[in-house]
Every structure is written in structure tokens, then in C-alpha cells.
């Protein structure tokens, strides 16, 4: 840029801010508006290739006003809890009113999934790249994948849909904490690859089935605690159903995680000239694969068979996914930690959540022994 263009680039902003100060005193904003229009014309002349179009600007303004993912965590919480309460009432006393209520909740949760999908499409259109490139986007993508698999596996299981809605609310709540930046930004150069569409989409989406398996494990333990002599037959049927769906979810998740890991090796070879380098993300992805392979095959070990131990294992195994994602991105140094850019933090609720799960496992085992283990 030479001559007048160079001078304009150097002086435009200081001149604009000075004119704003003067306009504030005189209440006449004609001059700042003129300078702003000149800046806009200059940007279009020299930066038209990178400037967003008017339609994208309008779309981003609408997206920010709607703030769909911030709203959805509240909606998912409300209808997930309401649906779960309705299902518990169904177990004890079924009737047309409660059946209709549960069906309405299920339809509403489906509509929330459509809204999530539209929100991701909007981010994709506005940014010009796949919406799973930073910490915030990857979390909302995990939430989307969790709801997708929850609705797919729970077509005939209302408890699965209710559990999915509840865990989606938790994920979206985490995404909207102040230590994550929801701003739509440009793509990090190392992610500017077609592998973003393939590797990242597959491996991050695999966290969805694992998350579903975790929340189904929690739901099964709660059902065990709610079991009594009068409802044992219905509870046993629901526990078997959720455990079967849990096994299916973990199997799908393991397949996706394994495929995603191999695809990551291909990308690593193109980017860094090696397929495997024991980077923290690579290592923990491998650890997660081994842990979930063990959990899925526990039923083949006589001493590790049983619905209680399987569901507890599906909850505990999720810790490896948390380490693979949050631990590596926020705490460890490696080639994959560029994606976060945030200050490492361990929210206090994590410790309370772990304590709650331990207590839940212990109490549920007492009821499991009482109602489901045959006494010899």
C-alpha cells in the first residue's frame, strides 16, 4: 500500500476516535459517520477477499441475538427432568395422561436437537469452516453428537431420551462457562486441512456415544436404588433395556474412536512427517481405546459379569475421555493443546460430582445385592 492509502491506514482510526470525542461534546455525529464510511470503503477495496459478506454479517448478528446454545442448556434441563419424572410415574402407575406427557416431552427434545443442528450449521456458514475447531465449538459438537446418538438409540426407550437431554444440558452448561470463548474466529493454520472434516469430526463425535453410555450407567444405578418388591419386574426390564443400549453406545463409540485415531495418524504424517509420536493426545486416545475395549469385553470374564459392574465401569471409563479431551487440551503440553488457548482450571463441581458418583455406586450396589443377586 503506497501514498494516500498508506497515510489513510495510519491516521484513520486515531482521526475517527478524536471525531467521536468531539461529537460527544457537540452531539453532532456527522463527521464520525463520514470517516466510518470511508474506513468501510477502504476495507472493501483492500480486504474484500477476507471480509465477510453482508449476508454472513446479518447471520452472525442473528446468531448472537438468538444465542441458541446458551438457551438450550436451560430447555434441555427443564424437559429432561420433566420427562424423567413422568417416566418414573409411568413405572409406578401408568395412564394415558402421563403417557401423553412423556410423548410431548420427547417431541420437544427432538425439536431442541433440530435447533442444535441449525445452530451448528449457522456457525459453519458464518465462519466458513467446520464448527469443531476450538474448545467451545468442540464441546457443543460433543453435545450435538450425544443428543444424536441418544435419539437414535432411544427411539423406543424414553429413559434413554430423558437421560440424553439431561447430560446434553450439562455439556452445554459447561460450554457456556466464562472460561470458554464462544466467539466465532478464524481457523488456526494447522487446522486448515481437509482432515479437519474427517479426523476431528469422527474422533470428537465418538465422545457422544461414550457420554451417552456414561449417563445411561448413572440412570441404571438410580433405577436400582428405586427398586422395591412391587416394581422389581418393571425396573428389571428397564435396567436390561438401558444396559443393552449402553453396550451398543460404547461399541459404536469405540469403533469411531479407533477409526478416528487411525485417521489422526494419517493427518500427523502429512503435517509432521510421522504417524505416531506419543503426543499426550495420541497417548490418551490409545489409553481410552484400551479401557473401553476392556469394558465392552468384561461380560466374557465370569467374575466381571453383571449389570451393576458393567454400568459402574461405563461411568468410570468416561474419566479417560475427560482426560483425553480436557486433560490434554487444558493441562498438558503437546501438539494438540493449541486448540484450547484457555487458562487451565478445574471447576469445584468436578470434585462434588466424583464424590456423588462414588456414593451412588455404593448405595446402588446395596440394592443390587438385595433385589438382583440370587442368594444361594
Regions found by a protein language model. Name each.
Residues 1-62:
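Soluble extramembrane regions of membrane proteins in the secretory/endomembrane system
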Residues 69-94, 102-129, 133-185, 195-225, ...:
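Hydrophobic cores of alpha-helical transmembrane segments in multi-pass integral membrane proteins
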Residues 51-81:
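Cytosolic-side membrane-insertion boundary helix
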Residues 188-192:
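Interhelical loops and loop-helix junctions of multi-pass membrane transporters/channels
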